[in-house]
Amino acid sequence: MATVVNSQTLTERQKAPVEQEQSNACIGSAEREVLQPRVKGLAACACLMAQGDLTRLEPAVRTALDNGVTINELKEAFSQLYAYTGFPRSLNALGVLGKVLENKQTGWQEGKPWTRPAEWDDAKKAYELGKKNQTQLSGRPFNYDFCPQDDYYLKAHLFGDIFAGDQLSAADREIVTVAALSGLDGVAPQLAAHKQGAVNMGNSQQLVDELSAWLCNEGYTLRSKWAKGEPNPYGKYFIGQSYLANVGGGVINVTFEPRCRNNWHVHHKQVQVLICVAGRGWYQEWGKEAVEMTPGTVIAVPAEVKHWHGAAKDSWFQHLTYHKDVQEDASNEWLEAVTDETYDKLK
């Protein structure tokens, strides 16, 4: 039987940064509105900026600019998001944009020139604009009497001063906000509110649903410090798409897209160790109940035990893996696929 241990008991070789458990709302996209490349570009940049993932943000910025997002729109998006992610991540993202622009491509557009909003010079006007925008976004008047300071900041500054800028429409601003919040832990109430707010500000419900699915299915909401790697060369033994990244020392990081799982298999004359580092997945031995894997879960798979592991239906999944107690003539034996009937019993 597999041994499941807490991450605090790892040896030095096994220790690795793990991410908090996340709930990725990956949903199907059949018969849904097609996301335009410009919307995808804004959303990808916002999601990665919110996570502080500057490595992935740089190519995302290039792709966004290639697909019609203007330079000034990205400046506005990264500036707006300081209200949700803080100045450090806002400034870091702007720094990435500046770095990318050092090698500016011919087709990239500046966009409309920036102009100073009149509301910045009239506090009352900014407050009234913010009150109007907040009411539309919330679907009703909103007054946060519990904390008048936050109530004022939200109305006068976020929905007033910031929304007064003309680089992005209100609908675009909510797309950016939903994407950013999708990349953060612990903000489920705000994310839900802004998904509805995105509709109230002019986006269709279908577009918002498709945006959420796309961010998850493309892996933007996989909050992980571990590289996804390249398509798995052993993909014929998997259902769905997976990726491998060699992290050194005999340790491999395996990334599974939602619903992806490997076939039943057996490790002969060796023990396999699995360490979940991001997302949510499953491990199951033949004839046993499946074990849920979340960041910090460690499983030692005994030799000669038939088993499989893979992602949950609604989440990406990453685990590190290596072998120990390896004997002479150790090998892996790949067996039949895990059927949908077996997999779909899991929640």
State what each model feature region is.
Residues 2-39, 50-66, 89-170, 192, ...:
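Acidic, glycine/proline-rich low-complexity segments that act as flexible tails and inter-domain linkers
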Residues 40-48, 74-78, 172-182:
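Short, structured motif recognition centered on aromatic/hydrophobic residues
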Residues 76, 85-88:
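Substrate/cofactor-recognition hotspot
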Residues 118-134, 328-347:
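Acidic/histidine-enriched, glycine/proline-rich intrinsically disordered or flexible terminal extensions
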Residues 222-250, 263, 332-347:
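A short, N-terminal "cap"/entry segment at the start of jelly-roll beta-barrel domains
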Residues 252-267:
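Conserved short histidine dyad/triad with adjacent acidic residue
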Residues 261, 268-295, 305:
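A short beta-strand-loop-beta hairpin characteristic of the jelly-roll/cupin
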Residues 295, 303-330:
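Ligand-binding loop in jelly-roll beta-barrel domains
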